[in-house]
């Protein structure tokens, strides 16, 4: 029974678009995590997520500034006022963006679709759980 639950979760969280890219939902990225004695978050990536590791994915969400001076942005499941950084959302609702080519101008809370390589961060507690490398706007 437990295996069927994971199959249903995976099916609900994954679609393929017309180009064969994996369209990932935020529900799929809602991995469990713990808090270290130092107060840092430590993600726990379930083994069924392994098929997404280092794969090209498509994800939609809101642009959230992490550091405007260095042009670091994240993609959030929620708008800025409700996201992990300013609201009460958990840390598994934001994804770090590393752009392939840095866009000239980004607008906070702009709803976008991003594609790139999904990287799992399980070793640097000062970065987000998921990183989309070679990110670019899609669609």
State what each model feature region is.
Residues 6-15:
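Bacterial N-terminal signal peptides
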């Amino acid at each position: 029974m437990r295996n069927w639950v994971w199959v249903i979760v995976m099916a609900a969280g994954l679609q393929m678009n017309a180009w064969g890219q994996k369209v990932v939902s935020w529900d799929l990225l809602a991995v469990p995590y713990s808090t270290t004695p130092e107060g840092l978050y430590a993600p726990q990536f379930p083994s069924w997520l392994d098929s997404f590791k280092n794969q090209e994915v498509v994800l939609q969400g809101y642009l959230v500034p992490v550091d405007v001076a260095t042009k670091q942005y994240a993609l959030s499941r929620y708008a800025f006022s409700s996201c992990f950084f300013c609201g009460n959302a958990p840390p598994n609702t934001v994804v770090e963006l590393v752009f392939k080519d840095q866009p000239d101008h980004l607008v906070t809370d702009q709803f976008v679709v991003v594609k790139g390589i999904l990287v799992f961060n399980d070793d640097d507690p000062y970065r987000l759980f998921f990183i989309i490398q070679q990110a670019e706007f899609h669609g």
